Amino acid sequence: MAKKKAFTPLLYLASIVFLPWWISLSFNKSLKSWITNWWDTRQSETFLNDIQEKSILEQFIEVEELFLLDEMIKEYPETHLQKLRIGIQKETIQLIKLHNEDHIHTILHFSTNLICFVILSGYSILGNEELLILNSWVQEFLYNLSDTIKAFSILLLTDLCIGFHSPHGWELMIGSIYKDFGFAHNDQIISGLVSTFPVILDTIFKYWIFRYLNRVSPSLVVIYHSMND
């Protein structure tokens, strides 16, 4: 009975680790056809206007072509102009297809991650007893560590998260999450998050030391400040 009671939280922990992967794999396949059909039937007209105004001009017309376009039209015979129009039309259709696929990919990943979050939230609520057992194990493990090891672990964690070299790690992590949700890479948004998120974490961590650790384990705070200095 005791073994079964100890095995259940471990099984629950393993299911939490692998459940997001299974949800993503399952819903990606089931939602892709529905989202593709919805996008093709309801969004194609609006999207085409957007492509005509922005992406097509940006990708198909170079600065030099803007100056030479009139000369090309005057000098080329009608057959060459016809081939040119056909080629541009084919490339335009291909570009629209690629952009449609990018938008479908974004909607699909965002929907899948939202569903995954809802399911995991419900799963966590239903498994509240297992979470309490896992929490007690973690607290017992941390309680048995010496203050020196605790201070070293806190110092290592803070240096990784909010230290001098942490922005590079945050940039990779936020970029990966941003990509996982299906959004296109945006340097301005990622740079903004990288510059603000560690500062917020640093403030929260200092408040935690001031309010919690000073009350629970003053010796740990002394060791931490000694190692940090």
Curated annotation (Swiss-Prot):
The keyword Transport applies. It is found in: Plastid, Chloroplast inner membrane. Its main location: plastid. It holds the Pfam family CemA. One of its GO terms (cellular component) is chloroplast inner membrane. InterPro entries: CemA. GO terms for biological process: potassium ion transport. It catalyses: K(+)(in) + H(+)(out) = K(+)(out) + H(+)(in). It comes from the Eukaryota. Keywords: Antiport, Chloroplast, Hydrogen ion transport, Ion transport, Membrane, Plastid, Plastid inner membrane, Potassium, Potassium transport, Transmembrane, Transmembrane helix, Transport. Contributes to K(+)/H(+) antiport activity by supporting proton efflux to control proton extrusion and homeostasis in chloroplasts in a light-dependent manner to modulate photosynthesis. Prevents excessive induction of non-photochemical quenching (NPQ) under continuous-light conditions. Indirectly promotes efficient inorganic carbon uptake into chloroplasts. Belongs to the CemA family. This is Potassium/proton antiporter CemA.
